[in-house]
UniProtKB/Swiss-Prot annotation:
It comes from Pan troglodytes (Chimpanzee). Glycans are attached at residues 169, 418, 567. GO terms for molecular function: calcium ion binding. Its main location: membrane. InterPro entries: Cadherin-like_dom (IPR002126), Cadherin-like_sf (IPR015919), Cadherin_C (IPR032455), Cadherin_CS (IPR020894), Cadherin_N (IPR013164), Protocadherin/Cadherin-CA (IPR050174). Residues 1-26 form the signal peptide. Keywords: Calcium, Cell adhesion, Cell membrane, Glycoprotein, Membrane, Repeat, Signal, Transmembrane, Transmembrane helix. PROSITE patterns: CADHERIN_1, CADHERIN_2. Residues 27-690 are extracellular. Potential calcium-dependent cell-adhesion protein. May be involved in the establishment and maintenance of specific neuronal connections in the brain. This is Protocadherin beta-9. GO terms for cellular component: plasma membrane. The chain crosses the membrane at residues 691-711.
Length: 797
């Protein structure tokens, strides 16, 4: 059965080794600086602006920042002055330990264009530590037969300082048996050796006490002391002997605590107590004693705490074997730590932008560095982002990567991206690190306001109250923030005569439209204008829509009676012969209404009458006709009030007053009609025109009557008595009462008229009618027509 290997996306993968190939962006360089340890925070290191050859203020303009390899801010950059300062008090011994020189590596990152400058800071040592012996007392067991010149290696003192400030010399207190000899080691350290100058005699002196002093090279010099107690032993002929001078072994860094690392073994040719060998670390440092422990009887070395290849990859120390007689031997143990894939890759963000403007391709979003503390295949890494996102990774120097936009983004399509940067090593098992970035796409004003309709139709009933809200326009804008805030305005009308500014207004913030004044349907039925919507982006975008306003008619005009004229002058009097048949047309009431539609539909009805049932009014055309045959008992004078009503809601009405005079002969005296009370009415321009027209017609009519009377007077041969006048002959004007032009009055009726002498009121009297002598067939026909009229007409009583 095959086991499939770990797979990764083929795109956007970046494989690199810690031995970087030198891929770099333009402008990369290398700088070396130094600072003394223990300097105060804010101490000056260098002026980067001058060192990089940049003008003042350029560092700030390019967003310069300092990033260290271990992501700790040891340094602080003042981008305005260009000074690089210490961000904390630096302790060389804590930062680097025994390593010399002590170097801190960092990078200087700049944008526009993006550049990386590599740099290093050396922390110079000062003599701030004194030499210290691990043991305040050292015990040496020396046989009394030890030859002169024999050297005994002593434990060296520890001094964290380096270079000239480290231990430079050892001295011994004055005595007659020993002196100090300085010897070096492969690691560059010096060790004190105690050299025997004079043979010891146990019988004379069993013990000696000496003081060992370690001196460093600082100024002033520092020192540390330890007491050496020498025990003089009886003769021990053989010292222990190790099987190997060098024990070399390997230990995986993930070895558990308590694991046996190696076993050393020494033999002694003596017997008894002198052959009993014990093992110990010789001149061991603190890290050896905390990491390993040795069994003094068996020589087995065990792991005391976990190993870390990334901290220490090997240990080399001396093991001492001492017999019971005080003789000793030493061997060297070299422990090599084997790397295991126990460290996931590290992703260190140097700069990050959580927002990017849409329509901006090739923008740097993040700069980060990848580290893997493992080695070999365990330290090789793959870095990638999701395939379905418009972003890519670009490698730079020193394991730096740049996250950039691949193309233009569209906020209206997607306003937020969750980007996951994944770094995986190639070790076994493979370890990975993920870092998520939430990116907000900021808006660019790339969408103009869009109206939901290209045109709007609004309806406003006339006689509205001023400042009435008549409607709204509501465009949408795909942008956000200020780019989506819309301001409304009225555009200049195409009709220059339209007083748009006095008709409507628009709320600039919400698009509400208001009628500024009361509209009159009779003056303005409809008008149109354009509304503009402009956003507050930069540059601003706009659109427009057409608005049509239709004024709805209200029943605000009462009917106006054109005939008979109701203007307060002498009332109109209609003459009706008593011989008139039912349905005889007396007159026609003519009225108009300034409204439209059903508000202008007029109906007529008889509101009041002197004698109900005698006259009727046609409901649809206002014709006043007789409803029955007239009799001698009917009064001669009649007053009719006709109601003219429109079809509005509520309906409006007007009245017309008619005076009807029944005549049947000229012998009857004239009864003066009562004067009509002048009506108070406001005449508009139409009324004036109608009055002028009626006055002209009346003048012509009066002139005709006078001519008619004169002719009749001339023809009469007999003198008239008092109150009487000659009966004229000839036709009576047919248009006297039928102002509507229907011509329905019988032409067979004619009247004699005479003016009374001295009359100041201009009254005229109607006398008896003169009936023409018609042919018999014509009279019968007229009677038949009158009978038909009586039966076929309908009336309102």
């Amino acid at each position: 059965m095959k086991t499939r290997g770990f797979s990764f996306p083929r795109q956007r993968q970046v494989l690199f080794l810690f031995l970087f190939w030198g891929v770099s962006l333009a402008g990369s360089g290398f700088g070396r600086y130094s600072v003394t340890e223990e300097t105060e925070k804010g101490s000056f290191v260098v002026n980067l602006a001058k060192d990089l050859g940049l003008a003042e203020g350029k560092l700030a303009a390019r967003g310069t920042r300092v990033v260290s390899d271990d992501n700790k801010q040891y340094l602080l950059l003042d981008s305005h002055t260009g000074n690089l300062l210490t961000n904390e008090k630096l302790d060389r011994e804590k930062l680097c330990g025994p390593k010399e020189p002590c170097m801190l590596y960092f990078q200087i990152l700049m944008d526009d264009p993006f550049q990386i400058y590599r740099a290093e800071l050396r922390v110079r040592d000062i003599n701030d530590h004194s030499p210290v012996f691990r043991h305040k007392e050292m015990v040496l067991k020396i046989s009394e037969n030890t030859a002169e010149g024999t050297a005994f290696r002593l434990e060296r003192a520890q001094d964290p300082d380096e270079g000239h400030n480290s231990i430079q010399n050892y001295t011994i207190s004055p005595n007659s048996f020993f002196h100090i000899k300085i010897s070096g080691s492969d690691e560059g350290m010096i060790y004190p050796e105690l050299v025997l100058d004079k043979a010891l005699d146990r019988e004379e002196q069993e013990e000696l006490s000496l003081t060992l002093t370690a001196l460093d090279g600082g100024s002033p010099s520092r020192s540390g002391t330890s007491t050496i107690r020498i025990v003089v032993l009886d003769v021990n002929d053989n010292a222990p002997q190790f099987a190997q001078a060098l024990y070399e072994t390997q230990a995986p860094e993930n070895s558990p605590v308590g694991s046996r690392i190696v076993k050393v073994s020494a033999g002694d040719a003596d017997s008894g107590v002198n052959a009993e060998v014990s093992y110990s670390f010789f001149d061991a440092s603190e890290d050896i004693l905390t990491t390993f422990q040795i069994n003094p009887s068996s020589g087995e070395i065990f792991l005391r705490e976990l190993l870390d290849y990334e901290l220490v990859n090997s240990y080399k120390r001396n093991i001492q074997a001492m017999d019971g007689g005080g003789l000793s031997a030493r061997c060297t143990v070299l422990i090599k730590v084997l790397d295991s894939n126990d460290n996931p890759p590290e992703l260190i963000i140097s700069s990050l932008s959580n927002s990017v403007a849409e329509n901006s391709p090739g923008i740097v979003l993040a700069v980060f560095k990848i580290k893997d503390r493992d080695s070999g295949e365990n330290g090789k890494t793959i870095c990638y982002v999701q395939d379905n996102l418009p972003f890519f990774l670009k490698p730079s120097v020193d394991n730096f990567y740049i996250l950039m936009t691949e193309g233009a983004l569209d906020r209206e399509s997607k306003a937020e991206y969750n980007i996951t940067i994944t770094v995986t090593d190639l070790g076994t098992p493979r370890l990975k690190t993920e870092h998520s970035i939430t990116l907000q796409v900021s808006d660019v004003n790339d969408n103009a306001p869009a109206f939901t309709q290209t045109s709007y139709t609004l309806f406003v009933r006339e006689n509205n109250s001023p400042a009435l809200h008549v409607g709204s326009v509501s465009p949408t804008d795909g942008d956000s923030g200020t780019n989506a805030q819309v301001t409304y305005s009225l555009l200049p009308p195409q009709d220059p005569h339209l007083p748009l500014a006095s008709l409507v207004s628009i709320n600039a913030d919400n698009g509400h439209l208001f009628a500024l004044r009361s509209l009159d349907y009779e003056a303005l039925q409809a008008f149109e204008f354009r509304v503009g919507a402009t956003d507050r982006g930069s540059p601003a975008l706009s659109s427009e829509a057409l608005v049509r306003v239709l004024v709805l008619d209200a029943n605000d005009n009462s009917p106006f009676v054109l005939y008979p004229l109701q203007n307060g002058s002498a009332p109109c009097t209609e003459l009706v012969p008593r011989a008139a048949e039912p349905g005889y047309l007396v007159t026609k009431v003519v009225a108009v209404d300034g409204d439209s539609g059903q508000n202008a539909w007029l109906s007529y009805q008889l509101l009041k009458a002197t004698e109900p049932g005698l006259f009727g009014v046609w409901a649809h055309n206002g014709e006043v006709r007789t409803a029955r045959l007239l009799s001698e008992r009917d009064a001669a004078k009649h007053r009719l009030v006709v109601l003219v009503k429109d079809n509005g809601e509520p309906p409006r009405s007007a009245t017309a007053t008619l005076h009807v005079l029944l005549v049947d002969g000229f012998s009857q005296p004239y009864l003066p009609l009562p004067e009509a009370a002048p009506a108070q009415a406001q005449a508009d321009s139409l009324t004036v025109y109608l009055v002028v027209a009626l006055a002209s017609v009346s003048s012509l009519f009066l002139l005709s009557v006078l001519l008619f009377v004169a002719v009749r007077l001339c023809r009469r041969s007999r003198a008239a008595s008092v109150g009487r006048c000659s009966v004229p002959e000839g036709p009576f004007p047919g248009h006297l009462v039928d102002v509507s032009g229907t011509g329905t009055l019988f032409q067979s009726y004619q009247y004699e008229v005479c003016l009374t002498g001295g009359s100041e009121t201009g009254e005229f009297k109607f006398l008896k009618p003169i009936t023409r002598h018609l042919p018999p067939h014509r009279v019968g026909k007229e009677i038949e027509e009158n009978s038909t009229l009586h039966n076929s007409f309908g009336f309102n009583y």
